[in-house]
Amino acid sequence: MNIVILAAGTGKRMRSALPKVLHPLAGRPLLSHVIATARTLQPSRLVVVVGHGAEQVQAAVAAPDVQFAVQAEQLGTGHAVRQALPLLDPAQPTLVLYGDVPLTRATTLKRLVDAAHDGRYGILTVTLDDPTGYGRIVRDAAGFVTRIVEQKDASPEQLKIAEINTGIIVTPTAQLSMWLGALKNENAQGEYYLTDVVELAIEAGFEIVTTQPDDDWETLGVNSKAQLAELERIHQRNVADALLVEGVTLADPARVDVRGTLRCGRDVSIDVNCVFEGDVTLADDVTVGPNCVIRNASIGAGTRIDAFTHIDGAQLGANTVIGPYARLRPGAQLADEAHVGNFVEVKNAVIGHGSKANHLTYIGDADIGARVNIGAGTITCNYDGANKFRTVIEDDVFVGSDTQLVAPVRVGRGVTIAAGTTVWKDVAEGTLALNEKTQTAKSGYVRPVKKKS
């Protein structure tokens, strides 16, 4: 089977410099959703017709299995499909999809393809309560499709028809070439419409078959930011419903966004206003508090993530405790039972089993062993303005508050570092590290007082 995806439109109503089909839905371009669905049908040829912003669109979705045809002039859907003909296998049927219709299920498309077997012409239709603006499917007394009539050309009787054309079709490819060549652009827009092919197929004696999607929203397209927002909410609610079926507890299914892939174990609980991006895995018994962002991360079983935590590119072991207001950046790796508390940032660092950094700390480019306590205000000074260096803290170290560790530096096993210490040399195992300081109390000191104006 050939699949052609039309993605050449300008999208003027989007009021954006970005090509319409590249606007994101759930974190991915609209066109990427359509291509992903198309791939599930295993086409022998997958062709995307580009036009407006062609180079940008091609760069965004380029892949070994995707070919591109260019529609240099915007002369209608029929003209667009004609540009793809040289790339199609004429012996196989062609399914035509749209790059701005991202939510059509693969099962819906397969049902249409199956119905159009043996050279039939298939149309995906939908019945709407309000079909205003759409082309109507006209049938004869026996129920056979005779034509598609556009809203502006419909008679009062035809305007009562609720079944409309979605534009998604399956057609014999060899005949399609002939039909497209016969199209005329005698309309107000001066364009060649793919819908006009239906009458040519009927005249040629081809049987027209129709199928419908399970849900009307599967055929909704995007022509404005308002429509994009509407489809985003439909998609996110579908994702939330699927999570609920899997046994995930959602505090409010309307207030969780998944912009990628979210895999959840048993008894996972997610509070409100959480966003999951990229590839995220939550193991059994993970609890995610409100207002968290988790991107490209693996979260171990029994972990608790408190409110307003941001996790990006991190790997967490089992029974860790994160947040509130913590930030784990790419390369952060936490072993089982590690704690990272409020206003702690971890980047490209390993934190060992049972180690804790509970408050106001920066840990970057570091290797921290097991059972280490990192006091409040500790900083690994890892950057000299040009190069990054690592800090190594071995097992059972106690780091006092307001400590600066100037990398590269190694702190041996069982070391205690006194509060307020700057460590710039390696510290031997089992010792106390401190900076000698003198504290003086001066009597008779008078604090300055502001003069009153």
UniProtKB/Swiss-Prot annotation:
Q: Where is this region: Pyrophosphorylase?
A: 1-225
Q: What does UniProt list as catalytic? A: H359
Q: Which InterPro entries match?
A: Bifunctional_GlmU, GlmU-like, GlmU_C_LbH, Hexapep, Hexapep_transf_CS, MobA-like_NTP_Trfase, Nucleotide-diphossugar_trans, Trimer_LpxA-like_sf
UniProt region (N-acetyltransferase), positions on chain? 247-453
> Into which EC class is this enzyme placed?
transferase
Q: What function does this protein fulfil?
A: Catalyzes the last two sequential reactions in the de novo biosynthetic pathway for UDP-N-acetylglucosamine (UDP-GlcNAc). The C-terminal domain catalyzes the transfer of acetyl group from acetyl coenzyme A to glucosamine-1-phosphate (GlcN-1-P) to produce N-acetylglucosamine-1-phosphate (GlcNAc-1-P), which is converted into UDP-GlcNAc by the transfer of uridine 5-monophosphate (from uridine 5-triphosphate), a reaction catalyzed by the N-terminal domain.
* PANTHER family reported for this sequence: BIFUNCTIONAL PROTEIN GLMU, NUCLEOTIDYL TRANSFERASE
Task: Describe its assembly.
Answer: Homotrimer.
Q: What is this protein called?
A: Bifunctional protein GlmU
Gene assigned in the entry = glmU
